[in-house]
């Protein structure tokens, strides 16, 4: 219950947009005695508690993919459904799917592309920039349904696929443009030392031209 301390401590801070519980917990029933309903019950309890402590901010969760009817029906106190979506260049399909199930607010809590192409075994910043532009624009085009997006991610992480003192190749198969592989240490729009990649300037241009 340490979260209640954080809510009470920071609920009046102007930087608080909303409170969010969990990141892709729905992918891990093993954390909840192999029964994902235990997570949804806990999420609902936490969301209801936060709303009683702070009625001025919505409560969200970072859900892996589109939430099921089980998740939606179990958590009426969740105001905003975040979705981590990796569907090649089509995050908008997930927006349509959730909108068909609920009128609750939604946002894309993760989306993006990495800068390493496993097919060519080389870094390809241009591909990442192109994919990032398409993904972000498709989300923005659906702003009547989707309130925003958190791009994954700002900075490369060197700890995820091997030696943390060097940038390693490694990850897993997924619907990631343009090689269907998520290279875990190449997701940043800047390098570890904060050198901007091509995708950084794409993101900058999109956000500068978008009305918020």
Predicted regions and their residues:
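Active-site groove signature of glycoside hydrolases
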Residues: 2-36, 60, 146-148, 153
């Amino acid at each position: 219950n340490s979260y209640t301390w954080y809510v009470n401590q920071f609920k009046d801070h102007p930087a608080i947009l909303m409170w969010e519980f969990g990141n892709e917990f729905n992918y891990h029933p093993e954390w909840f005695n192999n029964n994902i309903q235990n997570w949804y019950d806990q999420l609902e309890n936490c969301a209801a508690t936060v709303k009683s402590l702070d009625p001025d901010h919505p409560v969200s969760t970072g859900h892996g993919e589109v939430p099921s009817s089980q998740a939606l029906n179990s958590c009426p106190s969740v105001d905003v459904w975040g979705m981590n979506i990796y569907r090649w260049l089509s995050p908008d399909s997930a927006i349509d799917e959730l909108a068909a199930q609920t009128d609750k607010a939604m946002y894309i809590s993760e989306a993006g592309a990495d800068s390493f192409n496993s097919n060519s075994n080389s870094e390809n910043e241009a591909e990442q920039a192109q994919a990032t532009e398409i993904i972000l624009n498709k989300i923005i085009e659906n702003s009547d349904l989707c309130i925003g997006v958190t791009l994954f991610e700002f900075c490369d992480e060197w700890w995820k696929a091997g030696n943390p003192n060097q940038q390693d190749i490694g990850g897993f198969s997924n619907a990631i443009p343009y090689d269907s592989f998520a290279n875990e240490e190449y997701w940043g729009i800047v390098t570890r030392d904060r050198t901007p990649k091509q995708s950084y300037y794409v993101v900058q241009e999109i956000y500068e031209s978008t009305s918020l």
